[in-house]
């Protein structure tokens, strides 16, 4: 019997408070998973290329969903990095995102694990 570790960054309880029903949470979790899977590699590429404006657009989207699905510490971290993307030097944004990226990747895995538990094949 495999045991999935408790999520560190994903908060289904918080999502239920915001959304109100389990099916709605699952639908938005699927959207979140697709967004993270598509946008995290793009975000890293934009930061690597020094495209702060492009990175800021994606970070702004991430800032929008984190209060619904994530624990406060990750919400705060996303808000800080998104704020940096508006006025900081590229090197500062790159350094800040290098600390945030592993957390967002962990969140993506937590979302995938939760979805897999809901749809065992």
Regions found by a protein language model. Name each.
Residues 1-57, 61-121:
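Two-component system phosphorelay core
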